[in-house]
A protein has these predicted regions:
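Conserved HGGG/HGGXW glycine-rich cap/lid loop of the alpha/beta-hydrolase fold
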Residues: 14-63
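Conserved alpha/beta-hydrolase catalytic His-Asp/Glu region
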Residues: 16, 151-214
């Protein structure tokens, strides 16, 4: 798994791990809260038939560095800018899942000339109505989150993951929990997870109006993919996002929870390839 050390500004020296495959237009896959690059493993190869696909571990997650710093959306967007700069990518299309959607939107709003197309999968976008589950709200409480993460991290993670799927898939849940377990359960990883929960909540609550207003200015092509049975980010959230932008296409997925790219990978891959490069991938 390649590693890139970022240069310049607030991200100077930050190490990001990533997966890269394929040749063609650049596409960056941005995972959600608690995710990592390999959570896109059902999607990378089909997309790589027509594009150069980069799946990145965001700061604080996967095998990337986990600094003791802020984990606001602007910080993640700065890391994404540094990632593109380090790879020499003047422009790329972004595919963001869940929190990765909020990161991708933030980057598109602050660096519009560098984003060619934007696909949001089960994404949460600041400014549109969203209420985290009681479990996420509880873990975000200082002290309580630290206690829970110290004594029941794997169990808590599994319980949250089960809620993410329309029909819980034990193999997928076990993969999320077990893959690079040491990297994602070390104290620095738990601290980064909790900091992200708390810092992004500030963005969601204090900058909602700014995001709603800014979203109406986005001119780039946008694809929204959302599971009808998503219990993490309700499908109505996707409808709100679509109403704010003028160039959005929407794909609603039946019998699907918060992970369309896993639960209905074949359909989602077809939509993404067609949207990102303009023609379906070969069978």
């Amino acid at each position: 798994m390649p590693e890139l050390q970022l240069r310049g500004g607030e991200v100077d020296g930050l190490r990001l791990h990533y997966v890269v495959e394929g040749r063609g237009p650049a596409v960056i896959l941005v995972h959600g809260l608690g995710g990592f690059a390999e959570t896109w493993r059902h999607n990378i190869e089909p997309l790589a038939r027509r594009a150069t696909v980069y799946a990145v571990d965001l700061p604080g997650f996967g095998a990337s560095a986990k600094p003791r710093s802020r984990y606001r959306l602007a910080n993640f967007a700065s890391a994404l800018r540094g990632f593109m700069d380090g790879l020499g990518l003047a422009q790329a299309s972004l595919v963001g899942h869940s929190l990765g959607g909020a990161v991708s939107v933030t980057y598109a709003l602050t660096h519009p000339s560098r984003v060619e197309r934007l696909a949001l999968v089960g994404a949460v976008v600041p400014g549109c109505s969203f209420r985290p589950s009681w479990a996420f709200r509880a873990v975000a409480i200082r002290g309580l989150g630290e206690i829970a993460s110290s004594f029941a991290w794997a169990g808590l993670y599994k319980a949250c993951l089960a809620r993410c799927f329309h029909l819980p898939d034990r193999a997928e849940i076990d993969f999320f929990v077990d893959y690079r377990y040491a990297d994602r359960t070390e104290p620095e990883a738990r601290a980064a997870y909790l900091s992200t929960l708390r810092d992004v909540r500030i963005d969601m609550e204090t900058h909602a109006h700014d995001y709603r207003r800014a979203m109406t200015t986005l001119e780039l092509p946008m694809l929204l993919i959302h599971g009808r049975q998503d219990r993490v980010v309700p499908a109505s959230h996707c409808d709100e996002v679509a109403a704010l932008v003028s160039h959005a296409s929407v794909r609603r997925v039946d019998a699907c929870g918060h992970f369309p790219q896993i639960e209905h990978a074949e359909a989602v891959n077809g939509w993404l390839v067609d949207f990102l490069v303009g023609r379906p991938a070969p069978r």
